[in-house]
Amino acid sequence: MDTIGLFSVEAEHLFVEWVKKCIKKGDLTLFETLFNADPWIVNRCNKNKITVFMLICIYGRLDFLRFLFKQESYPGEIVNHYRRDKDGNSAWHYLAEKNNHLLLEEVLDYFGKNGIRVCFPNFNGVTPIMKAAMRGRTLSVLSLLKYGANPNRKDYLKGFTTWDWAVFTGHADLVKTLNKGYQKPLFMHFPLYKLDVFHRRFKKKPKIIITGCEDNVYEKLPEQNSNFLCVKKLNKYGK
């Protein structure tokens, strides 16, 4: 039984890798043929537990998605959009970090008809909106907020919120956007003691340096020497 099980896992992995090439090339006709033969192909996965549906989201194939949506009588009938890979990431995590918020909006509009969990975390507690914040995807963050994502939820390892990740990864535009409607001023959320924790535990410095002073917020310039604190000054609201 173990040998048969290993063979089936290997065979499924090879099959999904072959379908991956089909998706990468954008061969919708071949994919339609495969889907008609086995509709559950979209939930098959490779060794990393990445499903065919995740691959469609990763490569941003909107035509493939629209084809799948037309085959279902109701959202989620066939496609399992909450299925996780080996790191606990779902298709929502991959959609959120892509630089294509229109693709995310399309999927949100479709699955949102019956209600969706947009704060679905991976094994580290990172939600899709945090993934979008790490990449600086402002429009994706706003789309997820519109569908009920919680920007104040914290991950399991670092205890970061969406806003904290935007600060830590240096995406000032996203920080400004979040400050306008969803957060308090910068100095009230990212005090100096957090910076000390970064240095001790992770040996990494945030790309946006924030002082404890209410009127001073500093953004580190990436083109400067990292050994010197060369900054440009912003006001306390990040404008």
Swiss-Prot record:
UniProt subunit comment: Interacts with host PPIA. Interacts with host PPP3CA/Calcineurin. Interacts with host RELA/p65; interaction of the 32 kDa form with host RELA results in the formation of a stable complex with NF-kappa-B. Interacts with host PPP3R1. Interacts with host EP300; this interaction inhibits the association of host EP300 with host RELA, JUN and NFATC2.
Free-text domain note: The C-terminal region contains the docking motifs PxIxITxC and FLCV, which are required and sufficient for binding to host calcineurin.
Family per record: Belongs to the asfivirus A238L family.
UniProt xrefs under InterPro entries: Ankyrin_rpt (IPR002110), Ankyrin_rpt-contain_sf (IPR036770)
Entry GO CC: host cell cytoplasm; host cell nucleus
Xref: Gene3D superfamilies: Ankyrin repeat-containing domain (1.25.40.20)
Motif FLCV motif location, chain numbering: 228-231
The gene coding this protein: A238L
One Gene Ontology molecular-function label: protein serine/threonine phosphatase inhibitor activity
Organismal lineage: Viruses, Varidnaviria, Bamfordvirae, Nucleocytoviricota, Pokkesviricetes
Motif stretch (PxIxITxC motif): 206-213
Known function: IkB-like protein that inhibits the binding of NF-kappa-B to DNA, thereby downregulating pro-inflammatory cytokine production. Forms a heterodimer with the NF-kappa-B subunit RELA/p65 and prevents the activation of the NF-kappa-B transcription factor. Inhibits calcineurin function, which is required for the induction of nuclear factor of activated T cells (NFAT)-dependent immune response genes. Prevents the binding of substrates to calcineurin without affecting the phosphatase activity.
PTM summary: The protein exists in a 28 kDa and a 32 kDa form, probably due to post-translational modifications which are neither phosphorylation, nor sumoylation.
Source organism of this protein record: African swine fever virus (isolate Tick/Malawi/Lil 20-1/1983) (ASFV)
Subcellular localization(s) per the UniProt record: Host nucleus; Host cytoplasm
Protein name, as recorded: IkB-like protein
Pfam families reported for this sequence: Ank
Residue stretches of each ANK repeat: 48-77, 87-116, 124-153, 158-187
Motif Nuclear localization signal positions after renumbering to this chain: 81-87, 203-214
Induction of its expression: Expressed in the early phase of the viral replicative cycle.
Keywords: ANK repeat, Early protein, Host cytoplasm, Host nucleus, Host-virus interaction, Inhibition of host NF-kappa-B by virus, Repeat, Ubl conjugation
